[in-house]
């Protein structure tokens, strides 16, 4: 059965991911409902499940409305975030494996951005054009990582090292299009890093044409993401603090 992956840009910089198999779809972190509903209905697709990486409003805001339209859809979210994602129907924790659209999905504990943040990894999605998939919310961005709102640099370092161990070809489906700004900062830190500079040029060109830079890949992030390359929690914490305060000149 044919599978496909789609990115739906919404709001200022959110990206809602839609994974389709046959006549059913899975939606990841729907910030808002109307564009998702319109996209699915135009293609005569039913909503099978919603995957929630964490509780922030720009990730769960559209889910209740989508459930009104497709009340049988599962909502898979962290068991440790029941109070903040009260409409979840399938609570999970890191290390769990669930079946979604006939595919095995591994739940990964990547707490740092929030205390109960999880990611979803599909190691072997069916479909000739589909490589391994990682839906990582606000933990790993292309060229960056999430702010430490409820977690520590140690937790983020552990989370990124865990993600770095995934296969290089894994598609990194993060929830925001922050790549250009992230790489602008990174190039300012390492202006002689030719791999980084070239990636920044590529992304600037894509964004100038109104195209997304996502999905990235684990291999690309290993080569160009200073946070993933950090050798210690202390180094990551320094970089995160620096970027939080940095403004382009």
Swiss-Prot record:
Keyword Hydrolase attached: yes
Keyword annotations of the record: Hydrolase, Metal-binding, Zinc
Cofactor: Zn(2+)
SMART domains: Lactamase_B (SM00849)
UniProt pathway: Secondary metabolite metabolism; methylglyoxal degradation; (R)-lactate from methylglyoxal: step 2/2
Source species, domain of life: Bacteria
Reactions listed under catalytic activity: an S-(2-hydroxyacyl)glutathione + H2O = a 2-hydroxy carboxylate + glutathione + H(+)
Binding site for Zn(2+) 2: 58-59, 138, 176
Record-level GO BP terms: methylglyoxal catabolic process to D-lactate via S-lactoyl-glutathione
Subunit structure, as described in the record: Monomer.
Descriptive protein name: Hydroxyacylglutathione hydrolase
